[in-house]
């Protein structure tokens, strides 16, 4: 029975999501809230923690693999390896800390550098801790403007109240799915083109 369950899960489409952002912005809290419906305020930072969950995305069962990376500068050198494996990115900052918002530009540059061969990288900018409106340092218009400049979606979340937590993960998975479908279509088109070309050449030889 267990073997069948593993087989079924392994046949599901897997979307790989990377959590990116400065330390203390709530990346782990967002991840744990999405995974387990729990709010964890104090979390010890590590190099990276990986989570996997089966979800229903627009009527289809899929798996999401979430890699929660550390924001500390000490781990900057190993981030490249994590970024290479990612298919979509949640770029998180805290609305109560403007420095963490400023840092998103550097994180984005690192992602673009590592994924330079890819055309459009699925990425969402996430302003976390929206429940702390009285401590806001990053105006919503400023954050939204930066996201528009980058051509990506901006969403404000609260890991504490669970506001928009599911939304950011599901919206990102949709972008990842769209990119995969587009890439598969391109690959199939190229294969079809090669087949037609080969057939035409063989016809000429006959």
Swiss-Prot record:
Membrane topology recorded in Swiss-Prot or TrEMBL: Lipid-anchor
Compartment(s) of residence: Cell membrane; Midbody
GO CC terms: midbody; plasma membrane
Motif (Effector region): 43-51
Main location: membrane
A biological process from GO: regulation of developmental pigmentation
Region (Disordered): 180-206
A GO MF term: GTP binding
InterPro entries: P-loop_NTPase, Small_GTP-bd, Small_GTPase, Small_GTPase_Ras-type
Residues carrying lipid (S-geranylgeranyl cysteine): 203
Modification sites for Cysteine methyl ester: 203
Binding-site positions, GTP: 21-28, 68-72, 128-131
Catalyzed reactions per annotation: GTP + H2O = GDP + phosphate + H(+)
Highest taxon, organism lineage: Eukaryota
UniProt keyword list: Cell membrane, GTP-binding, Hydrolase, Lipoprotein, Membrane, Methylation, Nucleotide-binding, Prenylation
Subunit structure: Interacts with ralbp1 and rap1gds1.
The protein's role, per its UniProt record: Multifunctional GTPase involved in a variety of cellular processes including gene expression, cell migration, cell proliferation, oncogenic transformation and membrane trafficking. Accomplishes its multiple functions by interacting with distinct downstream effectors. Acts as a GTP sensor for GTP-dependent exocytosis of dense core vesicles. Required both to stabilize the assembly of the exocyst complex and to localize functional exocyst complexes to the leading edge of migrating cells. Required for suppression of apoptosis.
PANTHER family: RAS, DI-RAS, AND RHEB FAMILY MEMBERS OF SMALL GTPASE SUPERFAMILY
Family (UniProt): Belongs to the small GTPase superfamily. Ras family.
Name of protein: Ras-related protein ralB-B
Organism name: Xenopus laevis
Gene: ralb-b
């Amino acid at each position: 029975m267990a073997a069948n369950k593993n087989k079924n899960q392994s046949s599901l489409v897997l979307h790989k999501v990377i959590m990116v952002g400065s330390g203390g912005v709530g990346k782990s809290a967002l991840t744990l809230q999405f995974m387990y419906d729990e709010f964890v305020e104090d979390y010890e930072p590590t190099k990276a923690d990986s989570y996997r969950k089966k979800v229903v995305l627009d009527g289809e069962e899929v798996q999401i693999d979430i890699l929660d990376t550390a924001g500390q500068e000490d781990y900057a050198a190993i981030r490249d390896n994590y970024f290479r494996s990612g298919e979509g990115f949640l770029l998180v900052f805290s609305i109560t800390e403007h420095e963490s918002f400023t840092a998103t530009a550097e994180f984005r540059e690192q992602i673009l550098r590592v994924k330079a061969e890819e055309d459009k990288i699925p990425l969402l900018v996430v302003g976390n801790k929206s429940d702390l409106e009285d401590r806001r340092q990053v105006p919503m218009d400023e954050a939204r403007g930066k996201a528009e400049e980058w051509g990506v979606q901006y969403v404000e979340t609260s890991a504490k109240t669970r506001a928009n937590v599911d939304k950011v993960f599901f919206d990102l998975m949709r972008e990842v799915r769209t990119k995969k479908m587009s890439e598969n279509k391109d690959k199939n088109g190229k294969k079809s083109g090669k087949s037609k070309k080969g057939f035409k050449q063989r016809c000429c030889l006959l």
